[in-house]
Amino acid sequence: INVALLFDWIKSRPRMEVRWTLHDCWAFTGHCAHFSFVKCEQWKTGCERCTQTKEYPKSWVIDNCKENFRKKRSAFCNVGNMHLITPSEWLAGLVKDSFLKNYPVQVAHNTIDTNIFKPTDSDFRKEHGLEGKTVLLGVASAWSARKGLPDFIRLAQQLDDSYKVVLVGVTKRQIKQIPDDILCIERTDSACELAEIYTSADIFVNL
């Protein structure tokens, strides 16, 4: 999608109502989708010399964040009848500190299917030798330092044998690199299987 052309088209129709759901911070930065991990606050005034060009969305050649910031601010501001929607109060607060602050912001939390994600009987503990253990669970679609993978590794090293750290969503390559004291499970596309894993956990950890 050519974002600039899209917003030019929207602005040419001032009576159009626009509802834009933001799932990350990309809309108001010069490059990155997340900046908290690197403690960057350039997005409040203007991005330049980005330290995350190799992170999603990756840019391998040039750092164009300063120009991207200017283009986004020009494109996204001054839309006549636009409301923003975020899935969390946290993201809504960031929006209100950005160049999008003049738009109304509504929080609509992500929902879950309680017909699937509910206490579910399974043999997960037995199959993985977790009976009698206190299970600490971490789940991610893609594990990285920003998602807290190094912190889970340190946590597992500090716990005694009565605990077991279980990580869901790791890749085959990561499994080879992660210490054996962590139970690693590759990403599953089965919501029912994920519900069984959640039910088997004693503690869910989100870093």
Language-model features: locations:
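Membrane-proximal helix-turn-helix segments that form the acceptor-binding/catalytic region
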Residues: S12, Q42-L84, S98-F99, Y103-P104
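Conserved nucleotide-sugar donor-interacting segment of glycosyltransferase catalytic cores
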Residues: I1-C50
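A short beta-strand/loop micro-motif in the catalytic core of glycosyltransferases
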Residues: R19-H23, C77-E89, Q106, V205
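Charged active-site motifs of nucleotide-sugar-dependent glycosyltransferases
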Residues: P104, L130-L137, Y163-K164, I203
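Nucleotide-activated donor-binding/catalytic signature segment of Leloir-type glycosyltransferases, i.e.
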Residues: G169-I203
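Glycosyltransferase donor-sugar binding loop
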Residues: V139-A142, I153, K164-Q177
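Acidic anion/phosphate-binding donor-loop and adjacent secondary structure
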Residues: G93-K96, I112-E127, I175-I178
